[in-house]
């Protein structure tokens, strides 16, 4: 697939109060990020988690950092232990941490201290239903979301599930940061369309950085 914007400089696209898309912000770091994704997955493999209601998610997931997001019969939680390996989640790669902090600073959140990174792998047809990120103890900390590989349609709404949605194309290297007034806005990913990307072949990766523990 020919990238007509391969030489373009990153630019910012306002999304909502406290939210911005940093177009192509992760483009130059992508190859190292993908190598590090593979390294994390070699220690804590991708898996399709089951929701408390018994639904198997279409997105394959793993984590790195001090805490990892996972599902349980009683709900959703952050845990320092991977329930599949019974070992701590892999450490967050330096490339992840550096990119996340640069993106957060560019978006106006210079004090963000990520301690959890959820890695999602989307195959064609996989999606993420509308949801809020509300399992974190300090909702003043933003969310940083990095797109790699195949393009996807990102849905971004409001504080209510039935609020009007913005639908935006996220491409390889784009980073979305939201916090402040939009921290609890509903968001999701529409079913991924089949395609080819030279770095990820037939899939899309998403890195979601959060501050899941107490700030030091």
UniProtKB/Swiss-Prot annotation:
<dbReference type="InterPro" id="IPR005123">
    <property type="entry name" value="Oxoglu/Fe-dep_dioxygenase_dom"/>
</dbReference>
<keyword id="KW-0227">DNA damage</keyword>
<dbReference type="GO" id="GO:0035516">
    <property type="term" value="F:broad specificity oxidative DNA demethylase activity"/>
</dbReference>
<dbReference type="GO" id="GO:0070989">
    <property type="term" value="P:oxidative demethylation"/>
</dbReference>
<keyword id="KW-0560">Oxidoreductase</keyword>
<dbReference type="GO" id="GO:0005737">
    <property type="term" value="C:cytoplasm"/>
</dbReference>
<dbReference type="GO" id="GO:0006281">
    <property type="term" value="P:DNA repair"/>
</dbReference>
<feature type="domain" description="Fe2OG dioxygenase">
    <location>
        <begin position="113"/>
        <end position="213"/>
    </location>
</feature>
<dbReference type="InterPro" id="IPR004574">
    <property type="entry name" value="Alkb"/>
</dbReference>
<comment type="function">
    <text>Dioxygenase that repairs alkylated DNA and RNA containing 3-methylcytosine or 1-methyladenine by oxidative demethylation. Has highest activity towards 3-methylcytosine. Has lower activity towards alkylated DNA containing ethenoadenine, and no detectable activity towards 1-methylguanine or 3-methylthymine. Accepts double-stranded and single-stranded substrates. Requires molecular oxygen, alpha-ketoglutarate and iron. Provides extensive resistance to alkylating agents such as MMS and DMS (SN2 agents), but not to MMNG and MNU (SN1 agents).</text>
</comment>
<keyword id="KW-0479">Metal-binding</keyword>
<dbReference type="InterPro" id="IPR037151">
    <property type="entry name" value="AlkB-like_sf"/>
</dbReference>
<dbReference type="GO" id="GO:0035513">
    <property type="term" value="P:oxidative RNA demethylation"/>
</dbReference>
<dbReference type="GO" id="GO:0035515">
    <property type="term" value="F:oxidative RNA demethylase activity"/>
</dbReference>
<dbReference type="GO" id="GO:0005829">
    <property type="term" value="C:cytosol"/>
</dbReference>
<feature type="binding site">
    <location>
        <position position="133"/>
    </location>
    <ligand>
        <name>Fe cation</name>
    </ligand>
</feature>
<dbReference type="InterPro" id="IPR027450">
    <property type="entry name" value="AlkB-like"/>
</dbReference>
<dbReference type="GO" id="GO:0072702">
    <property type="term" value="P:response to methyl methanesulfonate"/>
</dbReference>
<feature type="binding site">
    <location>
        <begin position="76"/>
        <end position="78"/>
    </location>
    <ligand>
        <name>substrate</name>
    </ligand>
</feature>
<feature type="binding site">
    <location>
        <begin position="204"/>
        <end position="210"/>
    </location>
    <ligand>
        <name>2-oxoglutarate</name>
    </ligand>
</feature>
<feature type="binding site">
    <location>
        <position position="161"/>
    </location>
    <ligand>
        <name>substrate</name>
    </ligand>
</feature>
<comment type="similarity">
    <text>Belongs to the alkB family.</text>
</comment>
<keyword id="KW-0223">Dioxygenase</keyword>
<keyword id="KW-0234">DNA repair</keyword>
<feature type="binding site">
    <location>
        <position position="69"/>
    </location>
    <ligand>
        <name>substrate</name>
    </ligand>
</feature>
<dbReference type="GO" id="GO:0042245">
    <property type="term" value="P:RNA repair"/>
</dbReference>
<feature type="binding site">
    <location>
        <position position="131"/>
    </location>
    <ligand>
        <name>Fe cation</name>
    </ligand>
</feature>
<dbReference type="GO" id="GO:0008198">
    <property type="term" value="F:ferrous iron binding"/>
</dbReference>
<feature type="binding site">
    <location>
        <position position="187"/>
    </location>
    <ligand>
        <name>Fe cation</name>
    </ligand>
</feature>
<dbReference type="GO" id="GO:0051213">
    <property type="term" value="F:dioxygenase activity"/>
</dbReference>
<dbReference type="Pfam" id="PF13532">
    <property type="entry name" value="2OG-FeII_Oxy_2"/>
</dbReference>
<keyword id="KW-0408">Iron</keyword>
<feature type="binding site">
    <location>
        <begin position="120"/>
        <end position="122"/>
    </location>
    <ligand>
        <name>2-oxoglutarate</name>
    </ligand>
</feature>
<dbReference type="GO" id="GO:0006307">
    <property type="term" value="P:DNA alkylation repair"/>
</dbReference>
<feature type="binding site">
    <location>
        <position position="135"/>
    </location>
    <ligand>
        <name>substrate</name>
    </ligand>
</feature>
<protein>
    <recommendedName>
        <fullName>Alpha-ketoglutarate-dependent dioxygenase AlkB</fullName>
        <ecNumber>1.14.11.33</ecNumber>
    </recommendedName>
</protein>
């Amino acid at each position: 697939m020919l990238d007509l914007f391969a030489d373009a400089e990153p630019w910012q696209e306002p999304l909502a109060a406290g939210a911005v898309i940093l177009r192509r912000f992760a483009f130059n770091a992508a190859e190292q990020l993908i190598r590090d994704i593979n390294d994390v997955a070699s220690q804590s493999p991708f898996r399709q988690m089951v929701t408390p209601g018994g639904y198997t998610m279409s997105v394959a997931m793993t984590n790195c950092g001090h805490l990892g997001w996972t599902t349980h019969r009683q709900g959703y939680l952050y845990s320092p232990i991977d329930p599949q390996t019974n070992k701590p989640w892999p450490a967050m790669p330096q490339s992840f941490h550096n990119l996340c902090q640069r993106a957060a600073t560019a978006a106006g959140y210079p004090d963000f201290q990520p301690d959890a990174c959820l890695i999602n792998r989307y195959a064609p047809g996989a999606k993420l239903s509308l949801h809020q990120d509300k399992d974190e103890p300090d909702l003043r900390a933003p969310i940083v979301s990095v797109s790699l590989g195949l393009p996807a349609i990102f849905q971004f709404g409001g504080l209510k599930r039935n609020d009007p949605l913005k639908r935006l194309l996220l491409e390889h290297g784009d980073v979305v940061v939201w916090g402040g007034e939009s921290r609890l806005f509903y968001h999701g990913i529409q079913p991924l369309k089949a395609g080819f990307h030279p770095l990820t072949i037939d899939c899309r990766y998403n890195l979601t950085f959060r501050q899941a523990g107490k700030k030091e």
